[in-house]
Regions:
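Conserved glycine-rich cofactor-binding loop
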Residues: 16-17
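Substrate-binding pocket helix/loop in short-chain dehydrogenase/reductase
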Residues: 90-91, 95-100, 185, 196
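Alpha-helical segment proximal to the catalytic Tyr-Lys
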Residues: 119, 163-167, 224
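Active-site helix of classical SDR
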Residues: 114, 150, 158
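Residue(s) in the substrate-gating loop at a strand-loop-helix junction
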Residues: 134
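C-terminal substrate-recognition "lid" of short-chain dehydrogenase/reductases
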Residues: 126, 204-233
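Active-site loop immediately N-terminal to the catalytic Tyr-X3-Lys motif
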Residues: 92, 139-145, 167, 203, ...
Length: 237
């Protein structure tokens, strides 16, 4: 699916920085036409790139964004639901507003973009949806009750969508990154990060290229028979 002839269109949420920015540039370099979305503007300029300021947890925003993709591009071949927020805190000290904000962005945002994106994919003969979980889910990390719950929900959602969307030739798979040096973990105490890394089978920080390796795999034409799967980076020790 990485052959730019015929033109292939991808939407990446959370595209302004971090993993999303890396993946945007990665797939632009492969000839994809990429629509990136985030709540803020971007400085990325490329002939094959368009940016939409979108709150993925806002249904009207998502419907509008996918509507623009339909109008301008006429198709959607791949959706990478990368947008996410995180907060580490003991369960007893986590405000309801924090838990709600995490669930809305991480889970509801994935739900809404997948729903609207799949409608467009269905019209052009299929596509690939790649959702983002976290190594924290299988590791059951203390201090991440709200965050891990949102990511676990994404895993369950993805398995059901894999079944419901299979008749339309749409695959739905998940990548679960390890901690990567992005804004998402910048304020996490160093000791907490070290404890997390020690619980991985391969105890190191992840790299953007590690994530791209998995998304590349899911996007390969030969991966059309793979759906409902999760690949966790770093391994679970």
């Amino acid at each position: 699916m990485n052959d730019p002839q015929p033109r292939k269109v991808m939407l990446i949420s959370g595209a302004r920085k971090g993993i999303g920015r890396f993946l945007t540039e990665h797939y632009l370099a492969q000839g994809w036409h990429v629509v990136g979305c985030s709540r803020g503007p971007t400085d990325l300029q490329h002939d094959y790139y368009r940016h939409a300021q979108t709150d993925v947890a806002n249904e009207d925003d998502v419907v509008k964004t996918i509507g623009e993709v339909r109008k301008v591009e006429g198709r959607l071949d791949a959706l990478l639901n990368n947008a996410g927020v995180a907060s580490m805190n003991h369960f007893l000290l986590t405000p309801a507003r924090t838990a709600e904000a995490i669930m809305r962005t991480n889970y509801l945002g994935t739900f809404l973009l997948s729903r609207e994106g799949a409608k467009l994919m269905r019209g052009n003969g299929g596509g690939r949806i790649i959702n983002f979980s976290s190594i924290g889910v299988p590791l059951k990390l203390e201090g991440e009750a709200a965050y891990n719950a949102s990511k676990a929900a994404i895993g369950e959602l993805s398995q059901i969508l894999a079944r419901e969307l299979a008749p339309f030739s749409i695959t739905v798979n998940v990548v679960g990154p390890t901690p990567i040096a992005t804004d998402l973990i910048r304020n996490v105490p160093k000791a907490s990060m070290e404890r997390l890394l020690k619980r991985q089978a391969i105890p190191r920080f992840g790299a953007f290229a590690d994530v791209a390796n998995v998304t590349d795999f899911y996007l390969r034409p030969e991966s059309c028979f793979i759906t409902g799967q999760t690949i966790y980076l770093g391994g679970v020790s």
